[in-house]
Amino acid sequence: MIEIEEIAPEELPAFWDAHIRYLVEDGIIPDDEDIEYFTGDEYRGIIEAHMRRAEDRHYVVYFLHDGERIGAASYCIYEKESGKCFILDFWVFPAFRGSGTGRRCFEALARYAKAGGAVWYELNSEKEASVRFWKSLGFKESGTDEYDMPLFVKGKPEAHDDTDCL
C-alpha cells in the first residue's frame, strides 16, 4: 500500500534537489531560463509561502512504499472553487515506475487530498506519456491554461443552473 508523507516548509531544501532532477530528467523544463526560475528564490519562496497560508494551502508530499520514498507530488486545494485540487507536480521516481505504481500513487494522493477537502482534480500536461497516464485514470481534456497548456480534469462537479428553478 502506498502511504503519504507530507513535507513541512522547513523540509523543502532536501525536496528541491529531487524536484529539479525530475523536471529536467523528465523533460518538463528543457531550457536554461526555466531551470533558473525553478531553482530560484522567487519560485521557491512562493511555494513555501503558499504552504504556510491558511486558505488554499499548497501541499508537497512524498509517496512511500514500505517506508521508502518512491515519488512525490505537489498540489493546492482551492476551497472556493468547489474543492478543486490542482496538481502542480506528480512523479514516480524512475526506479519504481511501471506495474501500476503511478495509479496506486494517485489513488493514495486522492484519498489524502480528499481528507483535506479535495472534491475534484485539475492539472496541465502536454507530454504524450503523461497525457496517456492521466487519461487512463479518467481525466478528461478541458481546454487550456493561461500558458496554452492542455488542462485535464477528473470529478469536476457540474455547474448548477439556477434558471431550472424558475
Task: Give residue ranges: language-model regions.
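Acetyl-CoA-dependent GNAT
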Residues: 6-83, 88, 93, 112, ...
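Conserved active-site alpha-helix within GNAT-family acetyltransferase domains
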Residues: 103, 126-144, 148-150
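Terminal substrate-recognition subdomain of acyl/acetyltransferases
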Residues: 140-166
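Short loop/turn motifs at secondary-structure junctions
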Residues: 86, 117-119, 138
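Extreme N-terminal starter segment of soluble prokaryotic enzymes
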Residues: 2-3
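Conserved GNAT acetyl-CoA-binding A-motif
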Residues: 113-126
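Conserved acetyl-CoA-binding loop-helix of GNAT-fold acetyltransferases
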Residues: 92, 98-111, 136
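Short coil/turn motifs at secondary-structure junctions
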Residues: 78-80, 95, 128, 157
